[in-house]
């Protein structure tokens, strides 16, 4: 991570901008959803508004545009934590602004794609388990979510 985050004097203005940009995130497809998550997450962590918990808060908040538009959340697996931290650190070392350009998000977005694929596997396994239970009990339920929303 960088040696220095924005000063506490800069944080309110940066967070105002973050909130303004965050409010406009409305992904229409999988690629946009990944990019929205990446931009929201990277910029929040780069602003670093709290003494502790910025990564946890970024992971939570970055999922809201996805959930709001019918996508499942991106869950970063514990086993990928080192790669996650390394990618954020690499971004922050090369950036002069906490707000990433689209091209700067490519490595993090590729990482998120892998993590989201694992999330889909968890969702599909849960749907399979539910379907099997319904079949055994004779109850019909909704069809599983489609991955290509």
Describe the residue ranges of each PLM region:
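FIC/Doc superfamily catalytic core
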Residues: 1-149
């Amino acid at each position: 991570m960088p040696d220095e985050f924005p000063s506490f004097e800069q944080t309110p203005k940066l967070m105002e901008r973050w909130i303004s940009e965050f409010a406009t995130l409305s992904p229409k497809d999988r690629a946009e959803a990944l990019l929205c998550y990446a931009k929201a997450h990277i910029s929040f962590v780069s602003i670093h508004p709290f003494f502790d918990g910025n990564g946890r808060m970024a992971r939570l908040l970055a999922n809201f545009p996805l959930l709001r538009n019918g996508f499942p959340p991106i869950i970063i697996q514990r086993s990928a934590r080192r790669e996650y931290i390394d990618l954020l650190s690499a971004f922050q070392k090369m950036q002069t602004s906490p707000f990433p350009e689209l091209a700067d998000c490519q490595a993090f977005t590729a990482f998120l794609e892998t993590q989201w694929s694992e999330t889909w596997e968890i969702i599909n396994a849960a749907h399979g388990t539910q379907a099997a239970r319904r079949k055994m009990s004779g109850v019909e339920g909704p069809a599983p979510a489609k991955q290509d929303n």
